[in-house]
Structure formats: structure tokens, C-alpha cells
Amino acid sequence: MKRRTLDLLFSIGGLGLAVLLLVVGVVLTTNANFANNYVHDQLAAQHISFKPAGQLTDEERKSACLREYAGQQLTTGKQAECYANEFIGLHLTSIAGGKTYADLGEPQTALREQVAQAEQAKAANLADLQKQLADVSAQRDTVFKGETLRGLLLTSYGFSEFGRKAEQGALAMYLGAALLLLLSAAGLVHAVRTPANAAFAAPEQERITN
């Protein structure tokens, strides 16, 4: 095979692959932009803002991201992760001592049974049991709302991470396409400069030894 033909084949193939990488890069960029814009719009619509730096409690100040985002509106995936884990997570721990919505179900049910029995028996501690039930019910309701919001924010963070990964993939595609374009251009230049009758890896003539 002639060297020029081989150069042209590799160069054209490289150009085709570069175009393919560019197309994949554009698709990934489009998906990344959609993910980022969607997360931004959904979070911005909730009108959630971080506490100003001057209003942070001692426990909240221990969080680097709460200090970093202090006073800002929550609009990005990283901010959502911070708010969910460092702010909501902290306050959920203080509300019920780290117990979850499911954990509080058993004591709530037990107190309901005790209240029902106390009402039938007209027990003297009925008012105290009713207060305990009201407190546990309020805690469980608050924890449920907090866990729900925390879960939604972490879902937004996860969605934004898909967008970030797509951006990284798009960058890799663009760099790969640029490299292939350069190599293909070099191959075309070499093909033009190569004599038309030049062969690729022509066999060496045998040496005649006396």
C-alpha cells in the first residue's frame, strides 16, 4: 500500500472520530446544562436561604460550608447538600436526640395505648401522659418534615452531580476531538508532502555479498 493512501485513510478516520467525539461532547454539555438549570430553578423557587453569619449558633459555626454560604440563597447542588446534612441534619439530631421518624413511631404508639388506658381508668396521671404524647407527636411530625426536606435536597444534589459528571465527560470529549483533529491535520500535511509513488514499509533490497 502506498504511504500517501495510508496517511489519507488514517487522517480521514481520525476526522470522523473527532466529529463523533464532538457530537458526544455537545450531547453531554446539553445534558449538563439541563441538569444545572433544572436544579437551580427548582431550588430557587423554594426561597431557602442560609442563616447570616452573625446568626449562626456555636454548633452551626463548626460547619465550614455553613460559614461559606452564610446569608446566600440556596440555588446549587453543593449548597443543597450542605443545607441538608449540616443544617437540617444538625437540628434533627437536637430535636429528637438523633431518632428518626420511624424510631419515634414505637414510643408514640405506646403512649397512645397508655393514654387510652388512663382515660378508661380515669387515672390521675392522664394529663401528664397526654402531654408526653403531644410532645412525641410534635417531635415526630417535625422530624418527618425535616427528613422529607433533607431527602429532597439530597436528591437535588445527586441530580446536580450527574450534571457535573456530564460536564467532565464533555470536556474529555472536546480534548479528545481536538487531539484527533491535530493528528489528522498532521497526517493530511504528511500525505501531501509524501511522493505519490512512495510505498509504506518497502522491503529492503537484499545485499549481495561476495
Each PLM stretch: what is its role?
Residues 38-45, 200-205:
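Juxtamembrane extracytosolic/periplasmic "stalk" immediately C-terminal to the first targeting helix
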Residues 48-147:
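Long, solvent-exposed extracytoplasmic domains/loops
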Residues 1-38, 189-193:
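Hydrophobic secretory-pathway targeting helix
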Residues 2-12, 162-210:
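Juxtamembrane interface at the cytosolic side of transmembrane helices
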Residues 127-176:
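Short, aromatic-rich amphipathic segments at membrane interfaces
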